[in-house]
């Protein structure tokens, strides 16, 4: 039995890319990279980073810390977070804990005392400084919705 394959593949040849790529290499200008406080991952336009790990390993915490730090360091950056497991409020609770130095449980259960006031105020002010450039995707969690949200 012979199979006939048809393809609708879209591609570009190396020849077609070479001249523009060579000029780009020779200009010596590197890509735009948004700074944050961790050595990895690199956050830049068109750069996709895939992070994997066991449940509870800290993937969400790491990514949110990178996103928040990049937002804090680049006033023109906007971020869209798509998380199917945690609510926006829970994600912000975690960042408030990290930024304020308060225990996550204290924030989660809202068990504040007078001794928490200064750190809570400082953490909230930090979150408020970038929250207007942070958005959370709502279902459906598909690429079409991501694209529409990015254009909004």
Locate the predicted segments by residue.
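Generic low-polarity alpha-helical segments
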Residues: 1-2, 146
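Cytosolic-facing regulatory segments adjacent to core modules
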Residues: 35-40, 69, 73-152
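The Walker A/P-loop phosphate-binding site
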Residues: 2-102
């Amino acid at each position: 039995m012979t199979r006939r394959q048809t393809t609708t593949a879209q591609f570009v040849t190396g020849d077609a890319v070479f001249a523009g790529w060579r000029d780009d290499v020779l200009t010596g200008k590197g890509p735009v990279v948004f700074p944050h406080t961790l050595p990895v991952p690199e956050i830049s336009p068109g750069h996709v980073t895939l992070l994997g790990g066991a449940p509870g390993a800290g993937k969400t915490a790491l990514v949110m810390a990178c996103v928040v730090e990049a937002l804090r360091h680049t006033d023109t950056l906007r971020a869209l977070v798509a998380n199917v497991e945690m609510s926006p409020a829970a994600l912000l609770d975690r960042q408030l804990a990290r930024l304020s130095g308060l225990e996550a449980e204290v924030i989660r259960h809202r068990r504040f005392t007078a001794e928490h006031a200064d750190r809570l105020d400082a953490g909230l002010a930090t979150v408020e400084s970038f929250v207007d450039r942070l958005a959370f995707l709502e279902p459906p969690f598909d690429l079409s919705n991501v694209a529409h949200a990015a254009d909004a």
